Amino acid sequence: MSDAEASLLAAAAAARAAAICPHSNFAVGAALLASDGTVWTGANVENASYTLGLCAERVAIFYALTHGARDFTAVAVVTGAATPSTPCGACRQILLEFAADATVVTATTAGETMRTSVRALLPFGFDASSLARSE
C-alpha cells in the first residue's frame, strides 16, 4: 500500500467518528482524494426511515462536488466489519459517474485491507454512454 493510500485510509478512519448510525451501529468513514491533492471526507448518516439515510461514500463525494471538485484518483472506506466492506450498489453507481478511474481501498478498524477499482466494482455499469440512442 502506498503512503498516499495509507493517509487516505487514516482520513476515512477519522471521518468514521462522525457517523450517525443509531439504528445499525455500523459506522462508516470515507475519504476521496482529488487530483489536486485535496482530501474530502464523509460519514454515513442514518434515518429511522432507512432509505433516507446516506452512505459515507456519497456524503463525501457530494460534499466534494458541491465545493467544486471534479477529478478523483482514489477512494478509501473504513468500517468496523470483520472484513473490508466495499461500497454499496448505489455508491458504486455514483462513483462510476464521478470517479470512474479511481482506485478503491477499503479497510477494517483492525487493519485488514483490500484494494480494487471503481470499474472492477461495477464492471457493466450504467454511464453516460448508456444513454446514447441508436435511432
Range-by-range predicted roles:
Residues 34, 45, 86-88:
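Glycine/serine-rich anion-binding loops at beta->alpha junctions
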Residues 44-58:
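Compact, glycine-rich, soluble single-domain proteins
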Residues 27-34:
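Short beta-strand scaffold segments in enzyme catalytic cores
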Residues 12-15, 56, 60, 64:
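Stable alpha-helical structural segments in soluble proteins, enriched in small hydrophobic residues
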Residues 2-21, 67-135:
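C-terminal binding/interaction regions
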Residues 38-39:
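Hydrophobic "anchor" residues
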